[in-house]
Amino acid sequence: MTVLIHVLGSDIPHHNRTVLRFFNDALAATSEHAREFMVVGKDDGLSDSCPALSVQFFPGKKSLAEAVIAKAKANRQQRFFFHGQFNPKLWLALLSGGIKPSQFFWHIWGADLYELSSGLRYKLFYPLRRLAQKRVGCVFATRGDLSFFAKTHPKVRGELLYFPTRMDPSLNTMANDRQREGKMTILVGNSGDRSNEHIAALRAVHQQFGDTVKVVVPMGYPPNNEAYIEEVRQAGLELFSEENLQVLSEKLEFDAYLTLLRQCDLGYFIFARQQGIGTLCLLIQAGIPCVLNRENPFWQDMTEQHLPVLFTTDDLNEDIVREAQRQLASVDKNTIAFFSPNYLQGWQRALAIAAGEVA
């Protein structure tokens, strides 16, 4: 049997590193279909830190896509597992027959499913991408994204799968002992990416709570984002006093980020699509409820796991937030499907499906 090849077709260092380390640590030892990778980006020590994997790095999307297409044409039994995707040339190859549906398995990360960009280039490309997505052999996604995808592609097979968020299961009960009182701290967004709509989110928080809460905005990732960070900071200072606004421009190490999250009382995410599952998981683990846009279908996954969900359209106040915290504290977090290690079973099944080992 031909070994499955995993493709990280866009240079997203943080996510790519998370996926590679997860496969190295949790999957490679038990499955030959969890070891071969083609990745856009620099090695930066990844090969050394992931010795169980065979990783081929490419300088850009175009060179990787050309290599994938060549492999697909040379051996029609070769199957590929595309993580996130984000590579237009690969969608076009699937649409034109360069890659066959039986070779193309896609784990949806959110962005490459939704059509939120207003630029002309995107508007011209979206219909082609939509046609290509009808030809995917199988999609793997959250419950909400599967539901969203099925509305336009009902004939494509869909399987539940969660991004392998880095989590320590021993922390699942840690937050239950914490007493929450006094001025609330609200986390706005999960990164410095513009898709977080930080300024709109800050205005929404201010409309709900005024200048009575402390707002923390983590913007240390992606790099080279100084102009936008300053734009967000200035917009925030028009709404909140300096002592109530903390815009973080430096990238935080994982433990420091965990510490930051555990100082918060609420997470506020205004974006109208599924994203930021890693931050949501870590907040929920810490007993911190989240406010979602009702258009973000991840609320379906949360309610399926009996987790409280607040929406940006709700009338929010401290009493409502404290009640959501109380409800969250009563949930057995060891049973949540999208927490580690529970998502591991879904990954083992996904590998077997993509490799053709199970129907």
Swiss-Prot record:
**Topology relative to the membrane:** Peripheral membrane protein
Q: What's the stated role of this polypeptide?
A: Catalyzes the synthesis of Und-PP-GlcNAc-ManNAcA-Fuc4NAc (Lipid III), the third lipid-linked intermediate involved in ECA synthesis.
| E.C. number(s) listed in UniProt | 2.4.1.325
Q: Which organism is it from?
A: Escherichia coli O6:K15:H31 (strain 536 / UPEC)
UniProtKB keywords: Cell inner membrane, Cell membrane, Glycosyltransferase, Membrane, Transferase
Its pathway is:
Bacterial outer membrane biogenesis; enterobacterial common antigen biosynthesis
Location of the protein in the cell: Cell inner membrane
Q: Name one GO cellular component term.
A: plasma membrane
The domain of life for this entry's organism is: Bacteria
- Tell me the protein's name: TDP-N-acetylfucosamine:lipid II N-acetylfucosaminyltransferase
Q: What is its main location?
A: membrane
A GO molecular function assigned to this protein is: fucosyltransferase activity
Q: Which NCBIfam families match?
A: PRK02797.1-1, PRK02797.1-2, PRK02797.1-3
Catalysed reactions listed for this entry: beta-D-ManNAcA-(1->4)-alpha-D-GlcNAc-di-trans,octa-cis-undecaprenyl diphosphate + dTDP-4-acetamido-4,6-dideoxy-alpha-D-galactose = alpha-D-FucNAc4-(1->4)-beta-D-ManNAcA-(1->4)-D-GlcNAc-undecaprenyl diphosphate + dTDP + H(+)
Q: Which family does it belong to?
A: Belongs to the glycosyltransferase 56 family.
Extract one GO BP annotation from the record: fucosylation
